[in-house]
């Protein structure tokens, strides 16, 4: 896991085309010492890395991003205010692994993305 102890998987389920995970963020992780001191924010690139790591774990293979069709960071993800995040991933395999993913907690959506991986 690239992100070491930044998060842990609390719950993980999948079907042939979907992954649902609940993760617990570690607000004491060193990444938040610089982003930002006293007011931690989970960087958008880190949120996308978590999606990639969940996919790799479930599919049992390494992935590399090919294209990102859309990506929106809708709300700030402060790990102290929102220690758990539900991540939903829908995917189809064609020439590339096409995914639609979003992260939410208690009805609040934090990010949405459409990505193709190889």
Model-inferred region functions:
Residues 2-4, 73, 77-79, 118:
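A glycine-rich (often HGG/GG-containing) alpha/beta subdomain
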Residues 2-42:
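Catalytic strand-loop segment that frames the active site of acyl-thioester-processing enzymes
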Residues 8, 90-118:
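HotDog/MaoC-like acyl-thioester-processing domains
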Residues 13, 24-26, 74, 90, ...:
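A structural detector for beta-sheet-dominated domains
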Residues 16-20, 84-86, 98:
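Intrinsic-disorder/low-complexity, polar/charged segments enriched in Ser/Thr/Lys/Arg/Asp/Glu/Gln
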Residues 20, 70, 112-114:
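Well-ordered beta-strand positions in beta-sheet-rich domains
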Residues 45-53:
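Short amphipathic alpha-helical face segments that pack within enzyme cores
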Residues 52-88, 94-96:
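Hydrophobic beta-strand-centered segment that forms part of the acyl-chain substrate-binding groove
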